[in-house]
């Protein structure tokens, strides 16, 4: 749970942030 778990969590967080920023950008502009 040291290598794969951390990498997977990081990818998920970045993916969620990307969706939030993308949605805000499309909706705001």
UniProtKB/Swiss-Prot annotation:
It comes from the Bacteria. InterPro entries: YjcZ-like (IPR010070). Keywords: Membrane, Transmembrane, Transmembrane helix. Pfam families: YjcZ_2. Its main location: membrane. It is a single-pass membrane protein. This is Uncharacterized membrane protein YczM. The chain crosses the membrane at residues 8-28. Belongs to the SscA family. It comes from Bacillus subtilis (strain 168). GO terms for cellular component: membrane. It is found in: Membrane.
């Amino acid at each position: 749970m040291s290598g794969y778990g951390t990498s997977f969590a990081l990818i998920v967080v970045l993916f969620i942030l990307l969706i939030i920023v993308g949605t805000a950008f499309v909706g705001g502009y």
